[in-house]
From Swiss-Prot:
Function recorded in the entry: Component of the sarcomeric M-band which plays a role in myocyte response to biomechanical stress. May regulate expression of other M-band proteins via an SRF-dependent pathway. Important for normal contractile function in heart.
Gene: Lrrc39
Annotated SMART domains: LRR_TYP (SM00369)
Natural source organism: Mus musculus
Domain of life: Eukaryota
Name used for this protein in its record: Leucine-rich repeat-containing protein 39
Amino acid sequence: MTESAVCTGAVSAVKEVWEERIKKHHEDVKREKEFQHKLVRIWEDRVSLTKLKEKVTREDGRVILRIEKEEWKTLPSSLLKLNQLQEWQLHRTGLLKIPEFIGRFQHLIVLDLSRNTISEIPRGIGLLTRLQELILSYNKIKTVPKELSNCTSLEKLELAVNRDISDLPPELSKLLKLTHLDLSMNQFTTIPHAVLDMPALEWLDMGSNSLQQLPDSLDRMRSLHTLWLQRNEITCLPETIKNMKNLGTLVLSNNKLQDIPGCMEEMTNLRFVNFRDNPLRLEVTLPPSDNTDGEEEQELFGLQFMHAYIQESRRTEDQVNCLTQMPSSIHSDGESN
């Protein structure tokens, strides 16, 4: 073996040793950084947990986490150490998402995360079988997961002012205890089938959507006593509305109604109705009243107005029928002479 070959082999061996050492050094540095980052995360979680604990109160026997107007874009996993919480009240915190571990808070009764920037509801929400109220209004939610139907204790659901929700999964009809539903200021073009099939629903707000017509099956909501449909594009009301025997409040202001169906006279439980700002084909003026307060102003297009309109509509129809029959009558008289 020549001297140069020996020298080359020695250099290669030294090079391998140094490369191995450099590689090991880089790995050690990487592990050290990861360890430091882990320590930082642990420390931050502890600090966050300490801050969160300061926000926990007990009111009326409930353990409540209440945060208002403080920045919490995400919630740390250390929050799981407070899994006995029964109520979350987090408003105007900039919260971007509901944590995936939400399903582990089995004692939650109220989850109010309104006025944040949440874009989706995690499927784990369906694990909250004790949840009675879910308030997610004023967020950026576009869809609702079918897993929400597993929240079998849910009584109140508010999704108002998310602006982009246009439908609900049919599985939500399984929410047998839901009595209150707010879907106002979204993009619904019709009342979802899931809503029509909610057996206990008593209060529904679908104002400020894009509803153009109401389904004939509207009367399936037999328990409904309050229905808000203001600021839509509704052009007519189905005859089946007369079957909604429990309906006491009906708001239809700012729509495109041209008529009020006579069958609404049969709705004897109706106590408040509003037809203001609709292009109704008949002009009806109520008799003057001494009362000049705000309630009287509302009544101008309220229950008394509705009954007066229906009566006027019938009178107009009778007059038209009379006029259409008159020529044939005159013709008959002429033949008899």
